[in-house]
A protein has these predicted regions:
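Short turn/helix-capping motifs enriched in Asx and small/polar residues
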Residues: 1-52
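Catalytic glycan-binding domains that act on GlcNAc-containing polysaccharides
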Residues: 51-236
């Protein structure tokens, strides 16, 4: 370019100062103006979003919850982890960590938490019987001089999804829903990482059981990282 700047997918790089001119959207590491923690030989940053290192840590830190939820709902822990991993790598940027809970609190049907579940999806999972049904009475705040005040059902569900352990249970319940819905026409569904992750990504409103499902890029990414996340879980 005539400006001397180089466009690298998501940001412009200034070779004269060896720095990007804007912050890394993932805000990963101590310096947000460098590439891949300033270590391009060890790390890559294909999207400018959540780094592999950060996503790996999320799976490791929540391994106990993932394995426990998978056992409770009868889903493969590797598939559950791979689906969460795909959400973290492909669909999360730094803004999600800060604004999803806020906009969800005010009624926007946004994706929240480690499994990036929409509030409406969580309500559907409850309706189908995979998680307890929440109501406005299940949450609230103690306000000085006023006492305990309940919020709305939306607020309760949003706050619930911010809890990683509960969010993972919703994610496991959603995968179990798809297994149950598809098993008669596609008996191998419970072992298909790419298909289950695709269904999770597209959602129940855009999919219907059939005997010849095809994965999307999200599902393919989850399948490619299946063995990797099992290692992160300590299962290999």
């Amino acid at each position: 370019m005539c400006s001397g700047l180089i466009y690298l997918r998501n940001r412009y790089y200034d070779p004269s100062i060896w720095r990007f001119i804007t912050e890394d959207p993932a805000r990963d590491g101590l310096n947000w103006y460098v590439y891949a923690n300033n270590n391009p030989l060890k790390y890559i940053d294909p999207s400018g979003l959540r780094s592999k290192k950060a996503a790996d840590k999320i799976i490791k830190d929540n391994a106990t919850y993932i394995i426990s939820a998978a056992e409770e709902f009868g889903v493969n822990p590797g598939i559950l982890a791979a689906t969460i991993y795909a959400e973290q790598r492909l669909n999360v940027d730094w803004k999600d960590d800060y604004i999803d809970g806020i906009v969800g609190f005010y009624g926007v049907d946004t994706s929240i938490g480690i499994g990036q579940l929409r509030i409406s999806t969580a309500k559907f999972i409850e309706k189908e019987g995979y998680m307890p049904t929440l109501s406005a009475k299940d949450g609230g705040w103690n306000i000085p001089l006023i006492g305990f005040v309940h919020g709305t059902e939306q607020m309760v569900r949003e706050k619930t999804l911010e809890n990683s352990e509960l969010n993972i249970k919703y994610a496991a319940g959603y995968l179990k829903y798809f297994q149950d819905e598809w098993k008669n026409v596609y008996p191998d569904i419970d072992g298909k990482t790419d298909i289950l992750a695709t269904l999770y990504n597209l959602g129940h409103e855009q999919t219907s059981p059939n005997s010849n499902p095809k994965p999307n890029d999200f599902g393919k990414f989850a399948k490619e990282n299946y063995s990797h996340v099992r290692k992160l879980l300590g299962l290999e």
